[in-house]
């Protein structure tokens, strides 16, 4: 089963037009922490990325590579992965002292659930930092032992 999954993942990655080295590095780091990164349409319609905390699966919509936002999308989902680790399997905020850029606000303000809005605010805050990759990696290492 896992050999088939790995082969399918490699096949999908080979079809992606030159995924960034940072994307592949982050994908490997997530997988070493027990997350499964799947390049396929997420179960939630219209999502670019999705983390299902129950089984630590992360879907990345293949369209993000055509849009040039593959790494940014995985950075966002990496923050959610760190949130799951921090909550010991239940997603929780990390208490970060950074704010998202103004252009990102509409992407999380539409959530009516305050907890979900806070979780998304943190993910967008990290995603929009100039050092977003390094910040996401440090959060993953800090919270996912």
Model-derived segments and their meaning:
Residues 2, 15-19, 73:
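N-terminal targeting leaders of exported, membrane, and organelle-targeted proteins
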Residues 4-12:
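Sec-dependent N-terminal signal peptides
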Residues 18-45, 91-145:
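Metalloprotease/metallohydrolase-associated module, dominated by Zn2+-dependent proteases
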Residues 44-53:
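Post-signal-peptide N-terminal segment of Sec-exported extracytoplasmic proteins
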Residues 53-60, 105-107:
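Acidic/histidine-rich, surface-exposed loop or edge segments in extracytoplasmic proteins
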Residues 58-74:
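Short pre-active-site segment immediately N-terminal to the catalytic Zn-binding motif
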Residues 74-78, 118:
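Alpha-helical architecture
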Residues 78-95:
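Catalytic Zn2+-binding segment of zinc metalloproteases
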């Amino acid at each position: 089963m896992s050999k088939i999954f790995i082969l399918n993942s490699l096949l999908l990655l080979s079809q992606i037009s030159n995924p960034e080295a940072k994307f592949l590095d982050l994908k490997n780091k997530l997988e070493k922490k027990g997350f499964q990164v799947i390049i396929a349409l997420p179960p939630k319609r219209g999502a670019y990325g999705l983390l299902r905390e129950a089984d630590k699966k992360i879907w990345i919509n293949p369209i993000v590579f055509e849009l040039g936002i593959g790494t940014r999308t995985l950075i966002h989902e990496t923050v959610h992965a760190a949130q799951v680790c921090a909550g010991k399997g239940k997603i929780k905020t990390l208490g970060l002292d950074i704010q998202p850029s103004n252009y990102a606000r509409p992407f999380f303000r539409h959530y009516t659930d305050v907890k979900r809005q806070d979780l998304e605010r943190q993910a967008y805050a990290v995603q929009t930092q100039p050092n977003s990759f390094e910040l996401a990696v440090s959060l993953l290492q800090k919270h996912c032992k």
